[in-house]
C-alpha cells in the first residue's frame, strides 16, 4: 500500500492509495498544463535572475539548500539505517569501515548505484522527491506545475572499496544524438558534505551548447561505443579531444547536504567514487511536464508504480525495470523488488506518479 498524506494538514489527515495490483484512475482525470512560454531554451536573450541563467550558460547548476539541513540530515540517517538493517542486518556498521563489503550490504555497483530491492520506492526516496524546494526548481525550468517524476535509483558510494571493480571515468550524455535540443533536465539531491575527495558528479561545462555540432561531426565515427539504448552516448578519446579543442572544461561539482544538482541531458558527465573518509550519498530526481508523456507512457508508468519498479531517469517511463541484481554471480536472494518501508505520498506526490493524468481506461501492460 502507498499511504498518501496531506503534509499541509494535520498528521491524522491521511488517505490510503493501493499500489499492490491496480491503482484506480480517477473518474475525473486531471488535464496537465503543458510547458509554458518561459520553458528553458524557449526564449532568446532572456535573463531570469536565478539559477536558470547558470543552467543556460553552463549546462549545469547547483541549487543551494533545496532541502533544509534538518530534513536532509534525517534522510541521510534513514539511508544509513536502511543499510544497517538491510535483510534483517547483514553486518554493516556505519562506524566500522571493515564492514563495508558486499556480503554486508545490498548490491551496490562500482559507480555507487543501488538499483534493486524496490529502493526507487523506499520511503526516504519518495520523501526526497516530494520536497517543495526540489519540485520548485523543475517547475521554474519547465514553466508548469504539472510534472511527473522518475522512479530512479539512489547512490550509496563508500570510499576505498576493494570488493568492487574500479570506477573508471565513463563520460557520456543521456540523450539520443539524433534528437537535438533541450529534452530532459537531470537532477540529484546531495545528502552528505561532498568536497574534492568525496567523489561525485563531473560535468563538461558549456558542452551542451556544442552538442549538435559535435554529433554532426561524429555521426559516422568508426569506434562508436555500444549503448543499450539510443538515449545514451559514450564519448571516445577522439570525442574527448574534440571537446578539449573547443575549450570545454571538466568540473567536479562540490555540494553541501540538501543541495540540488541539475544538468542538461546534453551535458557530458560521469561520476567519481569517494577517496577520502566520507561516503557519497544522493538521490536522483528527474521531472518533466506530464503533458509531454503520452497516455501509453502514463499507463506504463502506472504499472511500474504498482509493481514498485524503477524507470531510470526518464519520468515518462521510457525504460522500465533494470539490470539483473547479482550477488556472487547469482540473482540476489534479498532482491524482492519491494521497498522495506511504505512511502507516504501527499496529494502532490501522487500527481508526480502520473496516475491522476491518465485519461483512458486502464489496460493491462
Question: Where are the predicted features?
Answer:
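Short edge-strand/loop segments of extracellular domains
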Residues: 156-159, 204-212, 286-292
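Short, structured patches in soluble enzyme cores that scaffold and shape functional sites
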Residues: 153, 158, 173, 185, ...
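Double-stranded beta-helix
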Residues: 184, 194-268
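Non-heme Fe(II)-dependent double-stranded beta-helix
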Residues: 2-7, 17-57, 64-178
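Non-heme Fe(II)/2-oxoglutarate
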Residues: 30, 92, 218-219, 257-262, ...
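A short beta-loop-beta micro-motif enriched in histidine and acidic residues
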Residues: 171-184, 248-249, 255, 278
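Secondary-structure boundary elements
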Residues: 139-148, 177-181, 190-198, 209-210
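Active-site rim elements
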Residues: 121-127, 173-175, 238-252, 270-273
Amino acid at each position: 500500500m502507498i499511504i498518501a498524506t496531506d503534509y499541509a494538514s494535520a498528521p491524522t489527515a491521511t488517505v490510503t492509495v493501493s499500489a499492490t495490483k491496480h491503482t484506480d484512475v480517477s473518474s475525473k482525470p486531471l488535464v496537465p498544463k503543458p510547458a509554458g512560454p518561459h520553458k528553458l531554451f524557449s526564449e532568446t536573450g532572456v535573463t531570469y535572475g536565478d539559477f536558470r541563467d547558470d543552467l543556460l550558460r553552463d549546462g549545469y547548476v547547483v541549487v543551494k539548500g533545496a532541502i533544509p539541513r534538518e530534513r536532509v540530515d534525517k534522510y541521510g540517517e534513514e539511508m544509513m539505517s536502511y543499510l544497517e538493517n538491510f535483510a534483517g542486518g547483514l553486518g554493516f556498521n556505519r562506524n566500522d569501515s571493515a564492514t563495508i563489503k558486499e556480503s554486508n550490504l545490498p548490491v551496490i555497483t562500482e559507480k555507487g548505484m543501488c538499483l534493486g530491492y524496490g529502493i526507487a520506492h523506499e520511503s526516504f526516496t519518495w520523501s526526497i522527491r516530494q520536497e517543495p524546494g526540489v519540485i520548485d526548481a523543475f517547475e521554474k525550468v519547465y514553466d508548469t506545475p504539472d510534472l511527473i517524476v522518475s522512479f530512479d535509483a539512489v547512490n550509496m558510494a563508500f570510499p576505498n572499496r576493494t570488493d568492487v571493480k574500479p570506477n573508471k571515468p565513463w563520460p557520456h550524455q543521456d540523450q539520443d544524438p539524433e534528437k537535438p535540443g533541450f529534452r530532459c533536465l537531470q537532477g540529484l539531491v546531495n545528502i552528505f558534505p561532498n568536497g574534492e575527495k568525496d567523489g561525485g558528479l563531473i560535468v563538461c561545462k558549456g558542452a551542451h551548447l556544442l552538442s549538435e555540432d559535435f554529433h554532426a561531426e561524429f555521426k559516422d565515427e568508426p569506434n562508436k561505443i555500444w549503448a543499450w539504448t539510443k538515449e545514451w552516448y559514450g564519448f571516445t578519446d577522439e570525442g574527448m579531444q574534440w571537446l578539449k579543442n573547443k575549450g570545454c572544461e571538466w568540473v567536479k561539482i562540490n555540494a553541501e547536504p540538501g543541495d540540488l544538482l541539475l544538468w542538461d541531458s546534453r551535458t557530458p558527465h560521469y561520476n567519481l567514487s569517494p577517496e577520502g573518509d566520507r561516503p557519497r550519498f544522493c538521490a536522483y530526481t528527474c521531472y518533466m511536464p506530464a503533458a509531454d508523456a503520452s497516455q501509453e507512457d502514463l499507463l506504463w508508468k502506472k504499472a511500474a508504480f504498482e509493481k514498485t519498479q524503477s524507470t531510470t531517469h526518464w519520468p515518462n517511463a521510457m525504460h522500465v525495470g533494470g539490470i539483473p541484481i547479482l550477488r556472487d554471480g547469482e540473482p540476489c536472494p534479498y532482491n524482492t523488488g519491494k521497498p522495506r518501508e511504505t512511502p507516504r505520498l501527499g496529494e502532490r506526490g501522487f500527481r508526480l506518479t502520473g496516475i491522476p493524468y491518465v485519461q483512458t481506461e486502464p489496460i493491462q501492460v
